[in-house]
Amino acid sequence: MTETAVLLWVTIGIAVAFDFTNGFHDTANAIATSISTRALAPQAAVALSAAFNLIGAVVTVAFFQAKVSNTIASTLAFKAGLVVIMAALLGAICWNLITWYLGLPSSSTHALIGGLCGAGIAAAHGLDGVRWSALAKQVASLVISPPIGFAVGAAFITALLLVIHQFKFRPVRLNRTFRTLQVVTAAFVSYSHGANDAQKTMAAMTLALVAAGDLPKFQVPLWVVFLSAATIAFGTYAGGWRIIRTLGWNILKLDPATGMSAQLTGATVIQAATLVGLPVSTTHVVTGSVMGVGASRKLSAVRWGVGANIIAAWIVTIPCAAIIAWVTFAILTTAGLHG
């Protein structure tokens, strides 16, 4: 086996590890609210989320093409080598693990984009390594999606409460209905997460195959689709309980109506972004929806201090992942790896 082939499969292995941490890290997006309101038992919620992550990743790419993968691949201004991709993935993985340990719902999407930027700048020995116009488009979608989630969540719960008040539904019956609906919306969030987030790993794997000369152009192979989908589902099943605690209990005390509203509005925003090819952070969108739903009812219902810590983690993710990837690239090339 040639050195390039070895580097390729090591890079694919690292991409699989990133995909696993993505699923592991982002389990909370889909199921935290369902668990906190007792709509789903923890293990049932995790199994449901894993299954729909798998379905979302495969179905979306099969029927709507890998639009998000193409957007991610456009970050670099040059044909990336394997060491660049390896360093980018390692930077993203490190940041995912750091924020998981701290219990912060940071963004795997931000981390990967930051990793690509850091490794690209290191490889090009300057800022020319990044296609800044493409990066600006990605960052714009990442920045505006949480406020959209917040606004849509606030508007939806306000309208829902008006309907409930108008028709004077019984609280016991309502809670039972909303708990049932939360199972459906948890599946919808999971489907949307798989559809958007698995494509980021597909992009990294396909870039590696192009760099190694195994693919003539950027086109996601079928085996990459299934490997990415299965891995993110497996990572989801492993679950990230620290972050589930933050989203499900620490930001806002949820009831079935607010939990269902946050899930439904978050999933809708994510799915819309996926269909137009924009990479968004499922973590940010769902967190924005949770905060919007809570704030619309009572500003003091939201624990804004926890929200501020989460926002701080969002802001530093891209630069921190970029720095880690830059250092990793320097270490790998100093060790004699090229490609």
Mark where each language-model region is:
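Multi-pass alpha-helical transmembrane bundle typical of ion/small-solute transporters
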Residues: 1-339
